[in-house]
Structure formats: structure tokens, C-alpha cells
């Protein structure tokens, strides 16, 4: 358990920084990004997301401080002493843990809520996008810990947790598609983009099949000791979570009220 606790906060900071860099490079007016942090608009998902991304950093740094990797301890004795003092105080440990859980959940759900706020895209016009992105994020996170964990008990625990997340994710996908198909003609046509349209192969094969169903079968067999644990299942889950976001974003951009409504 110690290995993952020491590695994950630093890895999270590195991956989050890469994502922040990608967001910055995607901005059209990069010199104006600082304006997001001089105000807070409770009704704006973009404002919430900006502040969540900022607040996650100190929470992760706190988690990193509580479980410093050995190379950092050896190189910086003063930080090691500070970490030891912080770890001896249960209140600080509890605060860091709760902060990471709350901010992690908000970070996972806000992207889906942000997309669902764009009513001009029929595919995104669903209240299930937020929970779907959250559960998908939890699933890929469990898969990542499962992948890097060195302790056998930890691998089994994370595989069981991931199986639960994958089952919920599959249910949410079914409800998401069913909601679109039972709505207006515009929503039905937008659903067809991922069911039998240009994004169907990526969605059905790489997200549902290789990203959820097959890993769920493999990990179910592994936790029941039918087959040995393998890195293939968590890798497929992580890849499936990434492709899910690509499909939702690009298929959503391809869905339009006017274009679909005026189609013959």
C-alpha cells in the first residue's frame, strides 16, 4: 500500500499539469486566462472547473507530503521532518484525505456538467453526462492503481472496486443512450452518431466492448481466482475511458439542432 500512496500524488500532479498545459494551448486568448481567477461565478460550470483545477494542486501536494517517496526524503531532510510532523497529527491527515476526495469527485464530474450545459449540442443535452464522467473517472483511477500496485491484496481490492465502477458505467451508458432515443427526433439522430454513425465503431468496440465488457469479464475471473491478474484489463479500462471522452466530445460537436432538424 505504501508504494501506491507515495507514487500516486506525484503522478497525479504530473498528469494534471499535462492536462492543464493542453487546456492552455487550446485557448484562443491565452493572455486572458488569468481573468478566470479574479472572480467566481456560482452559476458557471467553467468558473467552477477553473477553481477546482487550481485547488486540486495544494490538496495533492498535501497528500504527497504525507507519503513522501524515499528519494525525496533522502534529498530534502527538512521536508522529511515536516512530513513526519504532519503525519503525526490525525487532524491534518483527515483534512488532506477529505480534501482530495471532495475535490477529486468535483474534478471528475465537472467536465460532464460543463458539456451538458451546452444546449446547442443535442448529444450533450443530458443530465447523465456528469455522473457518467465521474464514474468513468473512478473506474480509470481504480484501473491505474490496480496497474501500478505492488501488493497482491491491493490489486484484488482495486480490481473488485473497478468491477463495480465498470458495471455502473455500463448502466449509465445504457440510460444515456436510452434517454436520447426516447427524446425528440434531433436527439435520436444525435444518438445514431454513436450507434450506427461515424463514431459507432469507436464507441461500441473500443469503449463498450474493449473498455468495459471485456475488462469486466477478465477482472471478475481474476478476483475469483479463475485466472491470474493481468495488466491487460486495467490498460484496456484506461484506454476505454480516454476514448469515451474523445467520442463524446467529437460526436457532440458533430450534432447540431439546425443541421439535424433540416436533414431530409
Over which residues does each language-model region extend?
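Internal alpha-helical transmembrane segments of multi-pass membrane proteins
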Residues: 3, 226-232
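Final/C-terminal transmembrane alpha-helix of multipass membrane proteins
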Residues: 232-251
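Juxtamembrane boundary at the C-terminal end of a transmembrane helix
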Residues: 246-264
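Conformational gate/switch positions in structured elements
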Residues: 20-21, 27, 170, 216, ...
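Long, contiguous internal "core" modules enriched in hydrophobic/ aromatic residues
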Residues: 44, 54, 59-227, 239
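Junctions where cytoplasmic loops transition into the N-terminal start of transmembrane alpha-helices
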Residues: 7-11, 161-164, 233-237
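Membrane helical hairpin/interfacial module
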Residues: 1-55, 59
Amino acid at each position: 500500500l505504501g508504494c501506491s500512496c507515495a507514487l500516486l500524488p506525484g503522478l497525479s500532479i504530473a498528469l494534471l499539469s499535462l492536462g492543464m498545459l493542453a487546456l492552455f494551448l487550446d485557448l484562443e486568448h491565452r493572455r486572458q486566462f488569468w481573468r478566470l481567477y479574479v472572480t467566481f461565478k456560482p452559476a458557471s460550470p467553467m468558473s467552477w472547473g477553473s477553481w477546482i483545477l487550481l485547488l486540486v494542486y495544494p490538496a495533492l501536494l498535501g497528500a504527497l507530503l504525507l507519503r513522501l517517496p524515499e528519494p525525496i526524503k533522502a534529498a530534502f531532510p527538512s521536508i522529511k521532518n515536516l512530513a513526519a510532523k504532519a503525519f503525526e497529527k490525525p487532524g491534518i491527515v483527515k483534512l488532506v484525505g477529505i480534501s482530495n476526495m471532495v475535490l477529486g469527485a468535483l474534478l471528475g464530474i465537472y467536465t460532464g456538467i460543463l458539456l451538458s450545459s451546452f444546449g446547442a449540442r443535442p448529444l450533450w443535452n443530458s443530465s447523465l453526462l456528469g455522473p457518467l464522467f465521474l464514474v468513468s473517472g473512478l473506474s480509470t483511477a481504480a484501473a491505474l492503481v490496480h496497474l501500478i500496485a505492488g501488493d497482491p491484496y491491493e490489486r484484488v481490492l482495486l480490481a473488485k472496486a473497478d468491477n463495480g465502477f465498470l458495471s455502473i458505467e455500463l448502466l449509465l451508458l445504457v440510460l444515456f443512450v436510452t434517454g436520447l432515443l426516447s427524446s425528440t427526433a434531433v436527439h435520436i439522430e444525435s444518438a445514431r452518431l454513436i450507434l450506427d454513425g461515424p463514431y459507432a465503431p469507436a464507441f461500441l468496440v473500443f469503449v463498450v466492448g474493449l473498455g468495459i465488457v471485456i475488462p469486466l469479464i477478465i477482472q471478475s475471473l481474476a478476483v475469483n481466482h479463475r485466472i491470474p491478474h493481468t495488466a491487460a484489463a486495467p490498460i484496456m479500462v484506461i484506454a476505454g475511458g480516454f476514448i469515451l471522452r474523445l467520442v463524446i466530445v467529437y460526436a457532440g460537436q458533430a450534432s447540431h439542432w439546425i443541421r439535424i432538424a433540416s436533414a431530409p
